Amino acid sequence: MKKIIAEIGSSHDGSFGNAMKLIEEAKKCGADFVKFQHHIAEFESLPNAPSPSYFKSEDRFEYFRRTSFDLEQLGTLKKLTEKLGMNFMVSPFSEEALDILKKLNVKFY
């Protein structure tokens, strides 16, 4: 049986409202899973560390800080996903990010 994963990643660009809308759009498209990324800047990068050119005027550290959701926000995204009958999946990029996913009982990471 095939499963469709809607890779949202960080395409919400730090907007919680956009993240909610992207989940709803994933449902309309028939997705079985929605997948986010969870970054915690302090555990992944240093302030003012060199960044790839696609980060434009923002360094990687600030980008991760601006686009990360807190525990409560992630919990709300998970609840909406499950309410719509999909599975919530997150890629953690540090052990600390994984700890947050475990607190939320995220099953897929």
For each feature predicted by the language model, list its residue ranges:
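N-terminal small/glycine-rich loop or linker at the start of catalytic domains
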Residues: 1-13, 47-49, 57, 75
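Active-site beta->alpha loop and helix N-cap motifs at the rims of alpha/beta catalytic domains
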Residues: 55-109
